[in-house]
């Protein structure tokens, strides 16, 4: 069974951006706690269960950049949860821009969702290095 990644979602999110310079980061990047009220904005459905989740998005509407960490509940079916996310996320949720790179993957009970452009490979690489 795959090891779960320990630590707060905020700390993990910070690690995902390691090695990316300030200039490369989207403007006005902020972390938003995901709740049952706002989850649809980030994962495309409110019909989803999770322990906790955190999004990192630009507050500028024309920047296609959304990184979401979802921690599954104890004993939850990770593959089913990933499938729900894959079927519902919307890389076109920004009015005039589209995220070209979409990634949904997990390590243990932690799911990473990337909808982004050139930063996607670096963020995914950082996720793969987490332990």
In which residue ranges do the predicted regions lie?
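Soluble, non-membrane globular domain cores that form compact, hydrophobic packing
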Residues: 1-131
């Amino acid at each position: 069974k795959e090891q779960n990644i320990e630590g707060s979602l905020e700390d993990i999110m910070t690690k995902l951006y390691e090695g990316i310079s300030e200039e490369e980061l989207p403007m006005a990047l902020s972390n938003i706690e995901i709740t049952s009220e706002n989850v649809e904005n980030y994962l495309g459905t409110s019909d989803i269960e999770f322990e906790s989740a955190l999004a990192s998005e630009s507050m500028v509407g024309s920047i296609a950049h959304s990184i979401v960490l979802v921690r599954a509940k104890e004993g939850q079916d990770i593959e089913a949860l990933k499938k729900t996310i894959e079927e519902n996320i919307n890389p076109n949720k920004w009015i005039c821009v589209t995220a070209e790179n979409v990634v949904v993957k997990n390590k243990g009970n932690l799911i990473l969702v990337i909808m982004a452009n050139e930063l996607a490979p670096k963020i995914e690489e950082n996720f793969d290095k987490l332990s």
